[in-house]
């Protein structure tokens, strides 16, 4: 991995997305991307009494779907980078706690997705160098 200029990183091994999973709410399900979602909810609260509980359930089910689709056993997941907009990553924290892996909470509001991809990519690149070289 090389730093090019002040903000650009060139990876020795480009990051690769092996699998995806997504659960969408009713508004997203009504849009043109509905066919790409793994599951579409009729109720954005998914039967829960609070947004925190609903989003924790969505995080947990989405991660379980991702693990299932990837074929990678959950005990092989070594780290998780995630974030949400509720109460200091509470939905991600509770949704991921049964996975029992180190969790890196990201506080980036709208940038959470891209920030998570960047941090995880750098982490994986460095981790692979430490472990396999």
Model feature map: region roles:
Residues 106-132:
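Active-site-proximal alpha-helical scaffold in enzymes
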Residues 1-104:
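Conserved "HGTGT" condensation-loop signature of ketosynthase/thiolase-family condensing enzymes
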């Amino acid at each position: 991995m090389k730093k090019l200029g002040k903000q650009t990183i060139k990876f020795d091994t480009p990051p690769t997305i092996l699998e995806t999973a997504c659960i969408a709410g009713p508004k997203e399900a009504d849009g043109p991307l509905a066919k790409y979602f793994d599951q579409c909810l009729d109720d954005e609260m998914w039967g829960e009494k609070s947004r925190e509980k609903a989003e924790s359930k969505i995080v947990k089910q989405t991660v379980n779907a991702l693990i299932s689709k990837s074929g990678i056993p959950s005990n092989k997941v070594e780290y998780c980078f995630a974030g949400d907009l509720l109460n200091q990553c509470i939905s991600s924290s509770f949704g991921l706690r049964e996975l029992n892996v180190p969790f890196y909470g990201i506080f980036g509001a709208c940038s959470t997705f891209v920030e998570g991809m960047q941090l995880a990519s750098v982490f994986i690149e460095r981790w692979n160098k430490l472990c396999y070289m």
